[in-house]
């Protein structure tokens, strides 16, 4: 599984081997209101997240739970972003605002139970390293 994650990342990210990797997900919550029925619907997007401490860059690559393919990478360079911080509530997420028009919330985990919705990979050490990088080198707060 780890090799498949690495292969997908390296295939779409130039100099991908220079990045450390974790898997995570982002949630897109759509609010709806149809008269008496209202609520929200959440879409889960799986991500391969790479970070390079030297260039202070995070790259998010969308993927699917079975890692059968991936989308185009999005680069978040520390000197180009508007702000970045770790959000503890309601979920533990790494929030990056590339500009005033939008943001990405990266949720990462040591392990998960639901392998149909998420990429499953035990990643305690990698997550600790990413958290330290984000807090110490990338966060704007």
Identify the residue ranges that each predicted region occupies.
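Anionic N-terminal interaction surfaces
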Residues: 1-53
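Low-complexity, intrinsically disordered short peptide segments enriched in small/polar/basic residues
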Residues: 2, 9-10, 19, 58, ...
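A generic structural signal for solvent-exposed, polar alpha-helical segments
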Residues: 25, 31, 55-57, 82, ...
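Phosphoinositide-binding peripheral membrane targeting modules
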Residues: 42-95
């Amino acid at each position: 599984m780890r090799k498949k994650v690495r292969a997908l990342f390296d295939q779409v990210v130039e100099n991908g081997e220079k990045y450390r990797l974790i898997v995570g997900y982002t949630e897109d919550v759509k609010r709806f209101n149809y008269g008496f029925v209202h609520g929200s619907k959440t879409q889960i997007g799986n991500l391969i997240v790479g970070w390079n401490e030297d260039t202070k860059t995070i790259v998010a690559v969308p993927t699917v739970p079975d890692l059968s393919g991936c989308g185009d990478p999005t680069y978040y360079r520390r000197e180009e972003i508007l702000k970045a911080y770790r959000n503890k509530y309601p979920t533990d997420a790494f929030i990056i605002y590339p500009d005033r028009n939008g943001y990405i919330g990266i949720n990462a985990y040591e392990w998960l139970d639901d392998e149909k919705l998420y990429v499953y990979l035990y990643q305690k050490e990698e997550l600790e390293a990413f958290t330290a990088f984000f807090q110490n080198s990338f966060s704007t707060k």
